């Protein structure tokens, strides 16, 4: 222990000796957190329309328990008139830090004052400007997660130095301004200007501080319901959606306050819909920002789309407790907030809408995404070591958003619902408006349950990868089970053995299935509880989806399931079985053409819209990635005809919508393209469905990518029809699919050289640039895209880098592309996080090549 302390002190000394380390190293953060407390920010921003920057003034108060130099974080702006406890100091910015001289600081409270400017841009900055082309209005908003607050104002930009914020904003008088707290007062200060004062916040981390400004309108203002704001050009659209959005949020507040035994922790709760917002939502304390398109659908929505919106709203709402009220100490515990927010969103919706079979939807939305990453060489543990916050962006992805909630469902099954809830209550109560780590939550669960969770946490939280669970069983001559065993192996071959609690399902032709509880803590275990039971038709090892891992059907069960799947009445079980069959395709154990044949035969009768949508997505993936050209050419006409027929004749509107999407996805031949053009021209329509702008532009994209003879005229007609701001974005996205070398060059140059292009325009166009049938055209851009990855990491928001890789690597299917990626990994000097992301994304390309070689 003494040796570790010496090492830590040496590391801290080294950080201080290097006056301005790059980013925010863990050692610097620990040193500051150990010395600094009682942080208070008083911030004034002046927002000027169309200006490339904002000006501001800051008064920062904090207490020190030991004197000496302090580093303040600030980058990409300028500072002036810096005083420290009344003494002038140099306002130099070096490597993203301002040095506060130790000679001017003292133990106890200190006061730092300065003027500053910070950049504003359409993309790539902490303060974003959006110009609404529909009415020429302007909106400015902030987005600081994980460590971009220091691009907006000087601060201690680490999650465990919480501060109280008092904000003042000067903006045009016609603008509405929203922040974490309510406005206390405002003052007219000149022609057309208003100065607004906001009340002081409770202690929050810098990444949770926020403001938005512009001609927003408050939608459906109703006492007792959360506030909802939208840009003025979308007010009418928002009015129609607002009651459902506000009502589910209001119900969620009541449910979560009772579940956590903790009232809503902030004075008010507003939601602000923002155009071009980089994420689905961001949970600023008391003021969640939402991507406008996630709330106001640009396509005809299905019932699943509406439920997914509920999940988004409840996810961000849960963060007000799990993330804002109690915050992880460092971003290596990012999963602690994201995993719980995702899990609790489903837990809450399952209680608010008990008829919706929410845990089936949890499986569909969560588990495949998690398994798809966790089986790759680029996966990470849930707990991710992040030595420097500059690398925190790479921690975001399916591991924290999908594996973490999947593991939490397993933990709730292990502990029991009551212990799980009581543990969360104890954890939140003990860390109110403070910071905590995973170990704190483990101790809370252990306290209420009396169970030791160290072995469980060691494998599930600290170890990467996942188990594959296999079942072996046999029956005697009297048709009773005489042998039943479970075994597991690490899918990465790294020797992991996980503690797994699961429920087995023994299914029979007649009569109810039998559920058997089982525990697998070693490489192999016999299940004595199954012995002597009647011989089942098939066995599935993860009934109700309590466990986490790959659960493939044994050969006997798989053969039975493929014969009887259409008659499985339990929709949750039917969904799980389809998922297991698809996993068998991805593991090259089941020929993709066999899966496609089964799916195309059974999906027309599938009345569960969410499952039908999954199956259609698998069919499209199978056609575009896993089968060879001859097989695809043979199957596509059947798929096109089926989609066209079901689009017109399915009894449910939701099904007609997903079959319309299916036709757009599988369309390849002339007849299908004619049908799409008929929908665009108005010569045809989907019964009962009003196609929305993005529906139409998606059809235009397909027609362009398929090089239809009328593509140019179709594109021009839609541009004329939809000249809105959104229409201009969709036109940009669609044109990226043009199958010409000139178009690809123009777009790629724009991606890497035009910082003014809004980030959501670029991100949405990446998939159309890499359309499934254009891999020969886009292969020359694979290496340049990989070369640009460090630039993307530096300049773009959290999820953009993953979208970049998924598009450019995911757009390829050939051994040549795989070889190029592997050679790049061999020779490129990459940061560890970027190397892992490439390994993660290239796994699908590797699988594609393997499947095509196995089933030529």
Show which residues each predicted segment covers.
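Hydrophobic alpha-helical and helix-loop surface patches within well-folded domains
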Residues: 2, 31, 198, 228-493, ...
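Bacterial N-terminal signal peptides
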Residues: 6-14
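N-terminal, polar/Ser/Thr-rich
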Residues: 17-55, 134-139, 159, 453-458
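Surface-exposed beta-strand/loop patches in extracellular or lumenal glycoproteins
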Residues: 57-76, 157, 166-172, 439, ...
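A surface-exposed beta-strand-loop module
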Residues: 74-133, 190-194, 524-535
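Beta-strand-rich binding/interaction modules
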Residues: 78-84, 453-454, 464-542
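Extended, low-hydrophobicity, Ser/Thr/Pro/Gly-biased non-transmembrane segments
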Residues: 115-220, 243, 548, 570-579
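Long, ordered, helix-rich scaffold segments
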Residues: 481, 494-496, 509, 528-856
């Amino acid at each position: 222990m003494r040796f570790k302390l010496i090492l830590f002190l040496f590391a801290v000394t080294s950080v201080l000796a290097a006056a301005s380390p790059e980013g925010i190293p863990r050692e610097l953060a620990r040193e500051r957190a150990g010395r600094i407390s009682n942080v208070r920010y008083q911030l004034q921003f002046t927002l000027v329309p169309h200006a490339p920057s904002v000006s501001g003034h800051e008064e920062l108060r904090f207490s020190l328990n030991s004197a000496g130099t302090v580093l303040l974080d600030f980058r990409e702006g300028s500072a002036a008139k810096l005083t420290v406890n009344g003494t002038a100091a140099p306002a130099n910015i070096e490597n993203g830090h301002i040095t506060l001289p130790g000679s001017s600081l003292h133990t106890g409270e200190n006061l730092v004052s300065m003027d500053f400017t910070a950049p504003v841009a359409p993309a790539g900055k902490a303060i974003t400007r959006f110009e609404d082309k529909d009415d020429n209005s302007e909106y400015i908003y902030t987005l600081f997660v994980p460590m971009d607050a220091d691009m907006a104002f000087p601060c201690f930009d680490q999650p465990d130095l919480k501060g109280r914020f008092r904000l003042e904003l000067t903006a045009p008088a016609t603008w509405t301004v929203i922040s974490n707290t309510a406005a206390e007062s405002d003052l007219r200060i000149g022609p057309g200007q208003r100065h607004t004062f906001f009340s002081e916040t409770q202690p929050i981390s810098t990444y949770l501080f926020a403001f938005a400004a512009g001609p927003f309108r408050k939608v459906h203002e109703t006492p007792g319901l959360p506030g909802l704001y939208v840009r003025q050009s979308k007010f009418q659209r928002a009015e129609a959606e607002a009651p459902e959005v506000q009502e589910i949020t209001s119900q969620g507040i009541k449910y979560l306050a009772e579940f956590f035994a903790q009232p809503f922790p902030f004075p008010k709760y507003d939601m602000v819909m923002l155009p071009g917002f980089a994420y689905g939502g961001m949970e600023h304390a008391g003021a969640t920002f939402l991507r406008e398109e996630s709330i106001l659908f640009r396509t005809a929505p299905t019932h699943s789309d509406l439920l997914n919106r509920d999940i988004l709203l409840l996810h961000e709402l849960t963060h007000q407790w799990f993330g804002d009220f109690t915050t992880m100490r460092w971003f290596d515990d990012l999963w602690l907030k994201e995993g719980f927010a995702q899990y609790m969103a489903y837990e809450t919706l399952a209680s608010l809408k008990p008829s919706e079979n929410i845990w089936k939807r949890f499986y569909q939305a969560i588990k495949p995404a998690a398994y798809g990453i966790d089986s790759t060489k680029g996966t990470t543990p849930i707990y991710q070591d992040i030595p420097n916050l500059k690398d925190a962006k790479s921690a975001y992805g399916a591991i924290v958003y999908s594996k973490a909630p999947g593991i939490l469902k397993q933990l709730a099954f292990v502990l029991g619902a009551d212990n799980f809830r009581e543990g969360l209550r104890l954890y939140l109560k003990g860390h109110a408006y403070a910071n905590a780590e995973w170990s704190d939550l483990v101790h809370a669960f252990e306290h209420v349950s009396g169970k030791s969770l160290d072995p469980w946490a060691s494998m599930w939280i600290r170890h990467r990868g996942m188990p594959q669970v296999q079942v072996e069983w046999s029956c005697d001559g009297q048709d009773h089970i005489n042998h039943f065993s479970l075994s597991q192996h690490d899918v990465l071959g790294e020797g992991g053995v996980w503690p797994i609690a699961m429920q087995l399902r023994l299914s029979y032709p007649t009569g109810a299935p039998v559920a058997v509880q089982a525990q697998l803590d070693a490489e192999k275990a016999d299940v004595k509880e199954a012995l002597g039971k009647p011989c089942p038709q098939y066995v599935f090892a993860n009934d109700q989806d309590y466990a986490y891992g790959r659960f493939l059907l044994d050969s006997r069960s798989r053969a039975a399931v493929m014969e009887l799947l259409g008659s499985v009445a339990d929709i949750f079980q039917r969904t799980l079985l389809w998922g297991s069959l698809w996993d068998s395709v991805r593991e090259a154990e089941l020929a993709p053409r066999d899966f496609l044949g089964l799916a195309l035969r059974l999906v027309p009768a599938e009345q569960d819209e969410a499952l039908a949508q999954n199956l259609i997505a698998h069919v499209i993936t199978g056609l575009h990635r896993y089968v060879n050209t001859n097989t695809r050419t043979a199957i596509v006409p059947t798929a096109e005809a089926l989609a066209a027929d079901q689009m017109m004749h399915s009894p449910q509107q939701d099904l007609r919508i997903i079959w319309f999407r299916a036709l757009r996805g599988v369309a390849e031949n002339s007849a299908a393209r004619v049908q799409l053009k008929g929908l665009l021209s108005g010569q045809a329509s989907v019964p009962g469905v009003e196609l929305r702008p993005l529906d139409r532009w998606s059809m235009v994209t397909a027609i362009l990518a398929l090089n239809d003879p009328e593509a140019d005229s179709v594109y021009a007609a839609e541009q004329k029809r939809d000249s809105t701001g959104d229409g201009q974005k969709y036109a940009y996205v669609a044109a990226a699919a043009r199958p010409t070398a000139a178009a690809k060059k123009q777009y790629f140059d724009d991606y890497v050289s035009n910082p003014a292009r809004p980030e959501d325009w670029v991100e949405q166009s990446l998939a159309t640039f890499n359309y499934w049938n254009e891999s020969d055209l886009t292969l020359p851009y694979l290496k340049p895209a990989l070369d640009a990855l460090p630039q993307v990491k530096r300049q773009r928001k959290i999820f953009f880098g993953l979208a970049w890789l998924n598009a450019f690597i995911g757009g390829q299917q050939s051994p040549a592309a795989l070889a190029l990626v592997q050679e790049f990994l061999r020779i490129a000097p990459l940061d560890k996080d970027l190397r892992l992301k490439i390994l993660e994304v290239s796994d699908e390309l590797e699988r594609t090549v393997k499947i095509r070689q196995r089933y030529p």
